[in-house]
Amino acid sequence: MSACAASLSPHQVPTTTTHDVVVVGNGPIGSAVARHVAAAGASVCVIDGRDSLTSAWNDEGRIVRPLDAEGRSCWQSWNLESLEGFPALQAESGVEFFTKCGSLACGTEAWVANPVKRLTEAGVDFTWHENGTAVEKRFPYLSVPQTHVAVSDAAGGFVNPKRMIQAQNIVMMMTAAGNEMTRVGDDETRRDNSDEGNDDTRRGNSNGPFEKENAFANKNLVVLESAVAVRAANGESPFVETAEGGARVAKLVVLAGGAYIKALAKVSGLTATTKSGSNNQQVSLDASVGVASIRLSRRTVLLAEVTSNEATSTLKHMPTVKYQWAPSENSGCDDQSNSSATTPAQTSTSTHGANEQMSVYVLPPIRYPGPDPPQGWYVKIGGGANDFFDDDTDENNTVEALREWMAGSGDDAVADRLHEVLVSLMPRTNFLTLVTKPCVTTCTADGELQIEKLGPDGAVVAVSGCQGKAAGPADAIGRAVARQVVETLKEQAGRGG
């Protein structure tokens, strides 16, 4: 339900089409799911709602690193798998989207211990920095407490999510159903991203959305439409109703619309699919698990401008940074909720949320093309305690609240705190213009991604609970979801569906 793909010229796509799989959402995960499902031979239609909904990932940089800040093995595996797969995806699509600048995690020894353990187990090369002096010697633009330690690696970096989605879309549509080649803006995209040696290009100097589409019904394609409901009746093919009056029919529908999934599932009246012996059983969505357990958190990011000279000299080799700025604050993320409505799932402590509350992430200077923010080089910082939306509101109010938040400029108080942390961390950097941006994350009590089957026979698969860190490893997450999708398609075929 979010976006960066193609316009519908010169060929208009029929309003009703039939595909093996319809993916609602053309963000980092949705585009990856679509590409990997297409690679298995299925026909795919991606519904891209960028004209009606604002996405949280719509930025120039998202971190991806070989460690997970909370030391979770599944997230680390996705990080590593995605990092390994980036070169092939970039080569096949002709789109450069990954900047390999390394990553750094800095905090108390106890805070860094779990990531170090996971890096060691995964066989990832890293450097240990024994105190604040060692950190500052290696990274002279940083200033951290003497009691802090750090671990750094050379494998991590950041992705430009808009370019990564382009790459996924191009490869998906090159892998057209029936072994026919369908390209979308391929040649133009290759020209836009061919300057590999240019530092501006390497760090994100182009939005580069597709300019044209030549995909037809029943081939792999992206359509600029808005999903308003998903219909899944027993014994019938599921389909997605669009605001444009069309229907995208499929054997299976994947919901990958980020913050909008929960509202879409509820307004569609979808039920959860559970196993009862050898049969599927439909039950109401459970607020303690799966999609219904997702909580939406308002997030604010700060973009701090630096001069082009500083970006390309002093800070040229700066890694991404995860920094524990408040070691004494160790309560769970949900303690900071502004919602009066609570459930057991909502009040339980999340390791991820607790970690976020006491830490920030920082990206090295990235060149933003303008106009918002104005063209220039910016260091980005975000993190801190969650600020949850009210769970009591109905689906329409939730979507409207999301629209209003994403149309604003974030929380000024949070931005002020982020600025204080950034200046303390990088006191020798001359920051110029400050720009605040809104973001939203989908959180769960256990900090894990949610993949849930909905509707009769599990014909709808919902993916959510990204915890604010799924854009970087989205390729591997998409591959994992695609495996489940393909397996479900095989089960349907076995039943004669």
Regions found by a protein language model. Give the residues of each.
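A conserved short coil-to-beta-strand element within the FAD-binding core of flavoproteins
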Residues: 183-188, 215-238
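Helix-loop-beta segment of a Rossmann-like dinucleotide-binding subdomain
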Residues: 94-105, 117, 128, 132-176, ...
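Glycine-rich FAD pyrophosphate-binding loop
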Residues: 38-57
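Conserved Rossmann-like nucleotide-cofactor binding loop
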Residues: 29, 52, 260
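Dinucleotide-binding Rossmann-like beta1-alpha1 core, especially the glycine-rich loop
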Residues: 61-138, 147-149, 359-360
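Beta1/beta-strand and adjacent pyrophosphate-binding region of the FAD-binding site
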Residues: 13-29
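C-terminal catalytic lobe of FAD-dependent flavoproteins
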Residues: 418-497
